[in-house]
From Swiss-Prot:
GO CC annotations on file: cytoplasm; microtubule
Protein name, entry field: Kinesin-like protein KIN-UA
Coiled-coil regions listed: 428-492, 530-621
Chain intervals for the UniProt region annotation (Disordered): 1-68, 286-305
Keywords tagged on the record: ATP-binding, Coiled coil, Cytoplasm, Cytoskeleton, Microtubule, Motor protein, Nucleotide-binding, Repeat
Domain of life: Eukaryota
Biased composition (Polar residues): 291-301
Cellular location(s): Cytoplasm, Cytoskeleton
Length: 919
């Protein structure tokens, strides 16, 4: 951009880089002598020190209750430019910074100085990275967690506000401003698959809101929600950001459209307030979701929990610089711009004064700037303000005004709220997809069912028809064959009989001519063969009769088989009827399911309406008590804080313990609602962390209840918290024996075998590790699977889990070493018998310090018992002891390893054999 005069007219930025805060040359001005000789009267303005941009801790209750958070203010000094180095060479500095004390001294004259204290004091040498980390990074982290956040720069024109916020760093990446660095952090933390980032870039020019991304949109209306007072700009361009490069291009486009002018104080003075709005929408990962079809409709109805969405909004405001007309030389249209800028900044100052003085009326509606920043001052956003000042004594009045603005802003308290809501739209879409899948699957199954019935019916009919034809043909053929055989046999018999009769008659006639005696004797001799032949014919006749009977029996058998096939056909028809009936039942079931699905849709709509109504009520009336054990418990957590301000120094769990009572808390461990049980277990675990509460918890049956939770529940969250509570109780020797007597080691081992979450395994391993430190429980701990459970948890590979496993092994080895020294332990270590030595040797050189330290101690304790020496030599543990005695970072462990090696005959013999010197 080029201008022709110091009071040049308005122009647009073309995207070129602004002049740097850094000067090409620096002149060291020494005012030490003056300061030493002048006794200054200083007035110290104090504020409570806290981390810049923070506020209190995050709200964990879904965003309904706010958390107080003061506006955080940092001051940044601009280096002298070339003109000031020449013009102010004879003048002492009017500003003295004390960054280590977070103080600023403003010299009024040679005798008086005012001292101010800020949340952060940034010298002229402070890098852009440091400015971002102390001013903006906490606010950006809060936005990622669902809070609204505001970062704003205020100061005289030409003091580096735009450089601090909007520098792109095209020539030097170290010059990147807060806008660029904030987007880098946001993109690094979100997942673009499930989360979204959208950006609007606006300017407030002459009391009109204009879109820097669309210059034609030059009068955007400000809309306020009458219910909660939220301010929105529905007419602004909203651009979704997917990568850093697109965001930089967007900033360049906006800077090119922003109004700027050449004045006496700044060659490129901003004539409008620039506002960057970044909306971050994040889906929170939960364990609850829709159940599968196999779990049944009733269970699916109970587990309909919508996903949680957190919405955070980051507002970065680059205010136009305040200026005095006689110094800036503004005239004409530039003068009108300066008046508008000063009026809006004056309105902002009035609002901050009213908030700092707790006035009943805050004039937010006096200016569009204050309407846009309503949530930033006295609202629900985390706000960080950086005020920029110059070193020149010529502008002492403007510098004083800027400092006093920052001091008043530090008195403003915001109520920080998390923006969290249920994503009913996502749940509805997911239910619709599941409903469509169920309908398609039902149609496919019904079609396959009908096709299978038709196939079975056709196949049965074909088989029956084929069987009937086959057996009918066989019966007819067999019948004809037997009839033919029978007729042929009868015919043969009749022919033989006729021949025999004729032969017999001829013989009788021939013999009749002889005398009577001869005839009689001869006749008897000839009749005998005929009688024999007749008897043979009778036998043949009997055989034929038997054959006929057999044929009839075969016919009857075939008829019986035919009847059987007809019965099979009848049963097939009955099966077909049954399948048809089943099909009708399935159709009715489908209609019933569709009705239930419609009911679920109506319930979902009712849930949405109820949730909206509840959210509105909470926004209007604050956090009220609701029904149910969980809300009762959470209300009891908050109630002591409201009723008894004197308990502010006590932890929340201790106040809950005094107000509610241990028995009431333990009774909630048996509640039907899983969330109530989880909250109750967390409270018991926090109480168990205090040694003073452990005896009361055990006497009230808390230990038994925790063990029953491990036994009777399958929720891994409950397992994790319950195991942590048991680990806290297991730090006491008396409680350790009670845990063993009540079967606690078996329940912990079972939980470890079924758990997959590293944090659950870490809690279980910590509990077993505490039990391993008891001398009296060694044998019982091993027999009930405690050592095996510890070694089984190394499958996880998580460093925290492995550290607890190593600690348990070290405790166990220490107890064995003590027993061996006292003469009550003989034979090999139980750890070596269970195969722990190989794992110890494999992980002795691990990079994780906590794991390595416990393993080194375990090796030293195992080596102190001579009965373990041969196994340790065989497994290579001796070489690890040699390494520990030489390279261990801890002197006590190194000395213990050396003393163990030199006192063991087995190790000394092996080392001499290998010619290894350990001196």
């Amino acid at each position: 951009m080029s201008t022709t005069s110091g009071t040049g007219g308005v122009s647009y930025r073309n995207g070129t880089q602004r002049s740097s805060l850094r000067t090409q040359s620096s002149a060291s001005t020494s005012s030490g002598g003056q300061k030493a000789s002048v006794k200054s009267k200083s007035v110290l303005r104090k504020s409570s020190p806290a981390a810049l941009g923070g506020g209190s801790s995050k709200s964990g209750g879904g965003g309904d209750a706010g958390v107080p958070g003061r506006v955080r203010v940092a001051v940044r000094l601009r280096p002298r430019n070339g003109e000031e180095l020449i013009a102010d060479a004879d003048f002492a500095d009017c500003v003295e910074l004390q960054p280590e004390l977070k103080r600023l001294k403003l010299r009024k004259n040679n005798w008086d100085t005012d001292t101010f204290e800020f949340d952060e004091v940034l010298t002229e040498y402070a890098s852009q990275k440091r400015v971002y980390e102390v001013v903006a990074k906490p606010v950006v982290e809060g936005v990622l967690d669902g809070y609204n956040g505001t970062i704003m720069a205020y100061g005289q024109t030409g003091t580096g506000k735009t450089y601090t916020l909007g520098q792109l760093g095209e020539e030097d990446v170290a010059d990147r401003g807060i806008m660029v660095r904030a987007m880098e952090d946001i993109l690094a933390e979100v997942s673009l698959e499930t989360d979204s980032i959208s950006v609007s870039y606006l300017q407030l020019y002459m009391e009109t809101v204009q879109d820097l991304l669309d210059p034609s949109n030059d009068n955007i209306a400000i809309v306020e929600d009458p219910k909660n007072g939220d301010v929105s700009l529905p007419g602004a361009t909203l651009v979704e950001i997917r990568d850093q490069q697109s965001f930089l291009e967007l900033l360049q486009l906006g800077e090119a459209h922003r109004f700027a002018a050449n004045t006496k104080l700044n060659t490129e003075s901003s004539r409008s307030h620039a506002i960057l709005m970044v909306n971050v929408r994040r889906s929170m990962k939960t364990r609850d979701g829709l159940s599968s079809e196999s779990n049944g409709n009733s269970h699916m109805t109970k587990s309909l929990k919508p996903p949680v969405v957190r919405k955070g909004k980051l507002v970065v405001v680059d205010l136009a610089g305040s200026e005095r007309i006689n110094k800036s030389g503004s005239e004409g249209h530039t003068l009108e711009e300066a008046k508008s800028i000063n009026l809006s900044l004056s309105a902002l100052g009035k609002c901050i004064n009213a908030l700092a003085e707790n006035s009943s009326h805050v004039p937010f509606r006096d200016s569009k700037l204050t309407r846009l920043l309503r949530d930033s001052f006295g609202g629900t956003a985390r706000t960080s303000l950086v005020i920029t000042i110059g070193p020149s004594p010529r502008h002492r009045g403007e510098t004083t005004s800027t400092i006093m603005f920052g001091q008043r802003a530090m008195k403003v308290e915001n109520m920080v709220k998390i923006k969290e809501e249920f994503d009913y739209k996502s749940l509805s879409r997911r239910l619709e997809v599941q409903l469509d899948n169920l309908i398609e699957e039902n149609e496919r199954q019904q079609k396959a069912f009908v096709d299978e019935i038709e196939r079975i019916t056709v196949e049965a009919h074909n088989q029956i028809s084929e069987a009937e034809k086959r057996y009918a043909n066989a019966l007819e053929d067999e019948k004809l064959r037997y009839q033919n055989d029978y007729m042929e046999s009868i015919k043969k018999l009749e022919e033989n009989w006729s021949k025999n009769q004729k032969k017999l008659a001829a013989e009788r006639l021939a013999l009749g001519e002889k005398n009577g005696l001869d005839i009689t004797s001869n006749g008897n001799r000839s009749i005998a063969p005929a009688l024999e032949e007749v008897s043979e014919l009778k036998k043949l006749l009997q055989k034929e009769a038997q054959s006929k009977m057999a044929a009839e029996e075969e016919v009857n058998r075939l008829k019986h088989q035919l009847n059987e096939f007809k019965k099979v056909e009848a049963s097939g028809n009955s099966e077909i009827m049954r399948l048809h009936k089943m099909l009708e039942n399935e159709t009715q079931q489908k209609e019933k399911l569709e009705g239930e699905i419609a009911t679920l849709h109506s319930q979902l709509l009712q849930l949405s309406l109820t949730a909206d109504e509840t959210r509105r009520n909470l926004e209007q009336h604050g956090s009220e008590k609701t029904s149910g054990a969980r809300d009762s418990l959470m209300s009891q957590l908050r109630l002591p804080q409201i009723q008894d301000p004197g308990n502010a120094e006590k932890p929340p769990v201790a106040r809950l313990f005094e107000q509610v009572g241990l028995q009431k808390i333990l009774s909630l461990l048996e509640a039907e609602d899983a969330d109530v049980r989880i909250h109750a277990v967390k409270v018991v675990a926090n109480l168990a962390a205090e040694e003073a509460n452990q005896q009361q918890i055990v006497e009230a049956g808390g230990l038994t209840s925790l063990l029953m939770l491990l036994k009777n529940t399958e929720d891994e969250t409950i397992h994790r918290v319950a195991a942590g509570a048991i680990a806290n109780l297991a730090m006491n020797e008396t409680n350790q024996e009670l845990i063993m007597d009540q079967g606690g080691i078996g329940l912990l081992s079972s939980t470890a075998a079924n758990a997959e979450d590293p944090q659950t395994l870490r809690m279980v391993a910590g509990a077993i590790a505490n039990l391993c430190g008891n001398d009296k429980l060694q044998t019982k701990l091993r027999s009930e699977g405690g050592i095996a459970a510890l070694l089984g948890m190394v499958r996880c590979g998580h460093p925290d889990v492995l550290a607890q496993v190593a600690r348990g092994i070290a405790n166990f080895a220490k107890c064995e070493s003590r027993a061996s020294t006292q003469g009550t332990k003989r034979g090999k270590s139980l750890l070596i018998e269970d195969g722990a030595l190989s794992w110890i040797v494999q992980n002795a050189k691990t990079e994780t310090a906590a794991i390595r330290r416990h393993i080194e101690l375990a090796l030293c304790h195992l080596a102190q018992h001579e009965g373990n020496a041969k196994e340790m030599v065989k497994e290579g543990a001796m070489w690890e002891l040699v390494r520990i005695s030489r390279d261990c970072s801890r002197e006590d462990i190194r000395s213990l390893a050396h003393r163990t090696l030199t006192s063991s005959p087995t190790f000394l013999t092996e080392l001499r054999r290998l010619r290894v010197d350990i001196r």
